[in-house]
């Protein structure tokens, strides 16, 4: 789950990490009231969407007067915004964050994440903040510093001071940096986060460090014990189909292709998409119906797939270990009848009760195309979509 900037800053402040004073607003008048409550300007007005790159998209404005604040908020609120991080998708701007604006002396970068390669919580820091860290890594990798955290020792003050001196900070600033790192470690672990990125972590004209922007990503598997974080979820920022899928506890991700996929198991689902591409097709989605799939779940999966008008064919690829192939077949038949599927459907079944499942499909009288294996199924659905065009 992702968070808005204002939510991230609330969490940072809760853990003693300094952030500029700010208030969120839903109308231009609320934005003016927020600015007045923060004291004398200047202020920053920032569109709240689940994406970075807002500045280049017109979503971050420097304002010297409250009239400027009102105009900036009016221009952002109620619109939709796309950035280089949204892959062309426009996200609604329902809120703006109004903050105090200080003069930036230096921008740094700091993040903490789970490094699957080293199997540790890892800090990444750079003296080049305010830009994409991938760009820094490609152009000036020597400016990036990392720390793999020992789970027994955790993060200590000397780790932060060492980082701070590598980034060219003064002794006072290195001490502040150390405090931020230690507090960030507590936040990361106590809130079950998968990523915290502060970019920029800035030195302002008062000589102190402040988190000017924050990007958080939580571990969805820990949602059951993070009710306060779940309450922060903004479904308006998410793909509507993915929201419905999450409520049905179906793993679904929208993609750009035209071949819908219904598969059980994440690994098999990824392999299915790969084989479709190898055969010249483009998957329209990732959909893992799960090992505990039943007839109703299959029907709901079909509805999810066909909610996209881009889908021109469906490949069902099931390996019946826990799930029974005959039950999947019953679900497919019911789904085709209930949803009114008008695109080609290719089905590959293997595993428990596979012959019973295949017989049900044959006896259904429906134009369901059988496949012997994953490659055969991918070839058949790609060909069927081409022929139906």
UniProtKB/Swiss-Prot annotation:
Record's GO cellular component terms: succinate-CoA ligase complex
Domain ATP-grasp intervals: 9-244
Species assigned in the record: Stenotrophomonas maltophilia (strain K279a)
Record protein name field: Succinate--CoA ligase [ADP-forming] subunit beta
Cofactors (names): Mg(2+)
SUPFAM superfamilies: Glutathione synthetase ATP-binding domain-like, Succinyl-CoA synthetase domains
Name of the encoding gene: sucC
Sample GO molecular function, one term: succinate-CoA ligase (GDP-forming) activity
Functional description taken from the UniProt entry: Succinyl-CoA synthetase functions in the citric acid cycle (TCA), coupling the hydrolysis of succinyl-CoA to the synthesis of either ATP or GTP and thus represents the only step of substrate-level phosphorylation in the TCA. The beta subunit provides nucleotide specificity of the enzyme and binds the substrate succinate, while the binding sites for coenzyme A and phosphate are found in the alpha subunit.
Cofactor binding comment, as recorded: Binds 1 Mg(2+) ion per subunit.
Reactions this protein catalyses: succinate + ATP + CoA = succinyl-CoA + ADP + phosphate; GTP + succinate + CoA = succinyl-CoA + GDP + phosphate
Record lineage: Bacteria, Pseudomonadati, Pseudomonadota, Gammaproteobacteria, Lysobacterales
HAMAP family assigned to the protein according to its UniProt record, in alphabetical order: Succ_CoA_beta
EC numbers, comma separated: 6.2.1.5
Keyword set, alphabetical order: ATP-binding, Ligase, Magnesium, Metal-binding, Nucleotide-binding, Tricarboxylic acid cycle
